[in-house]
């Protein structure tokens, strides 16, 4: 048996079914290119008979992608198979994937056919698909709830008919790892021609066990895993391919299998899919979540600084991230604060660690996460970090509509001076940002803008989190109001005042160094 596990991605087919709006052909091609760079073996590009748009997408991807084999889905219906072949025939080699429900529940209530009829339908469709290609996959839909005797019968018949890959889906995420592994083991023990096909698995996550079921199946002999990037999919989603891939890599010695995936493309691919599909990745998502390699506990931070393997079973670099992230919070220890100061180029003689750490804890209790510019302000400005903001928003007004250019005016106080400015923008938020930039004199570049709802209904608060770049440094801001534009304005004012403090830090640092040189 081969030690290579084939990675079959169905983000563009099964994953897209979960989206409120379909992806465009251009967007699907972007994802296909990313999957090709990732090293995915099989890309299921769509269900061509379902719509002209899906047909065009599959055809375009089949024409453009050269290093991954393109696959199209078809029911066990002659026209489905013919249309799938037509969409794929531009490629040098391709796969047709036919599926048919095999559980008693589906046979009785959906198909209304006997199991003998189902076997006949499946074998006939496989033979038809083999007219177009020698790479045919057959899926036993709802295999997880199919009686094992029937499952063995149809798998044997499908292989005899010419299927080169047999897929065993846990369509509704019903099985447990022990049970699902047992199904795969039974197939290998009871199907006499099992060695003539690759056994594949396709697990859904309704009970949160899609990845565990897939890994157990590989240990039982399956050599293809199907899933989607970020676990995208209907209901609770599909098996998250990035998790399976990294599980195989991290536990390679135990599992004795590998993939041909370029692991350093994982994070980049995940971010692209999230962006194009408009599906945010949860911070605690395994492998690709923003907290996956972030350490906040002081004990953990101290351990990671001494030896990363104490609390990291894989490196962020292994998935394409640059470095480990130590989040400075009230749970961080002195070692993490000292390390961050060293990373910024400061020596212990430049500041008093005891005083800095005490001030850091006070700020962290109040603010939550402390950033580099906050730390510098504490080190070189002391209590000035706690003083009132330099710039204060008095009011803002916006005007926008479908037939007018968005405009905004702002009034900002700086000490005893009132500054008023107006600007236009690409929407009311952008107009406010342009006006704030003019009023304060800071040319800003918005890097990220994230809006999340806090609560429900008319009284829900809109939290705006932004990252802004100024002179090569990134500054974070947060605003929280029922009015989204107001939240956005507050977030930007937060940034403006952080930038001003960072400038005062530079002034204090120069004074500090001048004093040291004089001594």
Curated annotation (Swiss-Prot):
**Which parts of the sequence are annotated with region: Regulatory domain?**
392-519
A Pfam family: LeuA_dimer
Q: Which GO terms describe its molecular function?
A: 2-isopropylmalate synthase activity; acetyl-CoA C-acetyltransferase activity; manganese ion binding
**Which EC number applies?**
2.3.3.13
Q: Where is the Pyruvate carboxyltransferase domain?
A: 5-267
Query: Which prosthetic group or cofactor does it need?
Result: Mn(2+)
Pathway note: Amino-acid biosynthesis; L-leucine biosynthesis; L-leucine from 3-methyl-2-oxobutanoate: step 1/4
Q: Which GO terms describe its biological process?
A: L-leucine biosynthetic process
**UniProt GO cellular component terms:** cytosol
* Top enzyme category: transferase
What keyword terms does UniProt attach to this protein?
Answer: Amino-acid biosynthesis, Branched-chain amino acid biosynthesis, Cytoplasm, Leucine biosynthesis, Manganese, Metal-binding, Transferase
Q: List ligand-binding residues for Mn(2+).
A: 14, 202, 204, 238
Q: Matching SUPFAM superfamilies, A to Z?
A: 2-isopropylmalate synthase LeuA, allosteric (dimerisation) domain, Aldolase
Task: Report quaternary structure and partners.
Answer: Homodimer.
| NCBIfam families recorded | leuA_bact (TIGR00973), PRK00915.1-1 (NF002084), PRK00915.1-3 (NF002086)
Q: Which family does it belong to?
A: Belongs to the alpha-IPM synthase/homocitrate synthase family. LeuA type 1 subfamily.
Q: What does this protein do?
A: Catalyzes the condensation of the acetyl group of acetyl-CoA with 3-methyl-2-oxobutanoate (2-ketoisovalerate) to form 3-carboxy-3-hydroxy-4-methylpentanoate (2-isopropylmalate).
Record-given protein name: 2-isopropylmalate synthase
Species of origin reads Proteus mirabilis (strain HI4320)
Provide the taxonomic classification. Answer: Bacteria, Pseudomonadati, Pseudomonadota, Gammaproteobacteria, Enterobacterales
